[in-house]
Amino acid sequence: MHTMATALTLEPTALPSDAIEVGRIADAWGLQGWFKVQPYSADPEALFSCKRWYLQPAARGAKAFGGTVLLPIRQAKDHGGMVLAWAQDIDDRNTAEALRGARIFVPRSSFPSPPPGEYYWVDLIGLQVINRQGLALGQVRELRATGAQTLLVLAHEQDGKAGKRMIPFVPAFVDQVELPQKRIIVDWQPDY
C-alpha cells in the first residue's frame, strides 16, 4: 500500500497562463486510488478531454502538497453529476484522500471546440458589448443562469458612476459574438 510519500511525487509546476479553474477534488472513491471531482460546470467536458490537470492546495484544511502541481490523468468518467478520475501515481485510497479539497485547473487551450453558435462563458468574460448603433453598453463581468435564460452582466459607467446592466444572452437580443474582435453586438438600448 502506498503512503503519503506517493503524493510527494507530484511534479511541482507553474500554472499555465490560460488556466481555468474547473472543479475541486471532493473525496476518494473506492480502494484503487480513484477520486470524485465536483465540476464547476454542468458539462465537464474539459475534465474529460484534458489529460494533464493542475492542482492547487485546498483553501482550508490539511494540505498534502504546496503550490501548483501537475497531475497526469489516466482516466476520467461521468458519475451522476460528479466526475470520477484516476491519476498516475495515485494508486490507493489514502493517497486519493490526501488530495481532498484540491482545486483543479486545466488550460483553456485544452477545452474541446464548442459547437457553432455556442460559447464557453469564460470566453465571453471581458468582451465589450455594443448595440447595433455602435454605442458601447459595457463590458461583460459575469454570466448568470436564471433557469429560463442566461444573462450577460455588464459593468458600465453612467454619469461618472459605476453601474450594472443585464442583457439576456438569447438570439432575440444577441446579433453576433465576435471573439477575435473581443465584442458582442446586441439589439439593446441603454435605457432598457
From Swiss-Prot:
GO terms for biological process: ribosomal small subunit biogenesis; rRNA processing. GO terms for molecular function: ribosome binding. Its main location: cytoplasm. One of its GO terms (cellular component) is ribosome. It holds the Pfam family PRC_RimM. InterPro entries: PRC_barrel-like_sf (IPR011033), PRC_RimM (IPR056792), RimM (IPR011961), RimM_N (IPR002676), RimM_N_sf (IPR036976), Transl_B-barrel_sf (IPR009000). It is found in: Cytoplasm. Residues 116-192 form the PRC barrel domain. Keywords: Chaperone, Cytoplasm, Ribosome biogenesis, rRNA processing. The keyword Cytoplasm applies. It comes from the Bacteria. Binds ribosomal protein uS19. Belongs to the RimM family. The PRC barrel domain binds ribosomal protein uS19. An accessory protein needed during the final step in the assembly of 30S ribosomal subunit, possibly for assembly of the head region. Essential for efficient processing of 16S rRNA. May be needed both before and after RbfA during the maturation of 16S rRNA. It has affinity for free ribosomal 30S subunits but not for 70S ribosomes. This is Ribosome maturation factor RimM. The gene is rimM.
